[in-house]
Swiss-Prot record:
Organism the protein comes from: Methanococcus maripaludis (strain C5 / ATCC BAA-1333)
Cellular compartments annotated: Cytoplasm
Cofactor(s) this protein requires: Zn(2+)
Name of the coding gene: rpo10
E.C. number(s) listed in UniProt: 2.7.7.6
Keyword Nucleotidyltransferase: yes
Keyword tags: Cytoplasm, DNA-directed RNA polymerase, Metal-binding, Nucleotidyltransferase, Transcription, Transferase, Zinc
Protein name: DNA-directed RNA polymerase subunit Rpo10
Keyword Nucleotidyltransferase in annotation: yes
Cofactor note: Binds 1 zinc ion.
Primary residence: cytoplasm
InterPro entries, A to Z: RNA_pol_su_RPB10, RNA_pol_suN_Zn-BS, RPABC5/Rpb10
A molecular-function term among this protein's GO annotations: DNA binding
Reactions the enzyme catalyzes: RNA(n) + a ribonucleoside 5'-triphosphate = RNA(n+1) + diphosphate
Length: 68
């Protein structure tokens, strides 16, 4: 779905680095290195990025909207 503003577990704001993460991921960088560079250190916050679906630069939300 839409990327959350805050981590579900600890409540830290994570959405402010999402666009850079997405851009760098699309350029073929390693997700672990991107999160390290963006200083996303907590496991719960890293999980939010790792579990968010991006397929060919399309989010799950883009697929669901087609069926409204």
């Amino acid at each position: 779905m839409i990327f959350p503003i805050r981590c579900f577990s600890c409540g830290a704001v994570i959405s402010e680095v999402y666009e850079e993460y997405r851009t760098r991921l699309k350029n073929g960088e390693n997700p672990e290195e991107i999160l390290n560079d963006l200083e996303v250190k907590k496991y719960c916050c890293r999980r939010m990025f790792a579990s968010h679906r991006l397929d060919n630069d399309r989010e799950l939300f883009d697929d669901i909207v087609e069926y409204k």
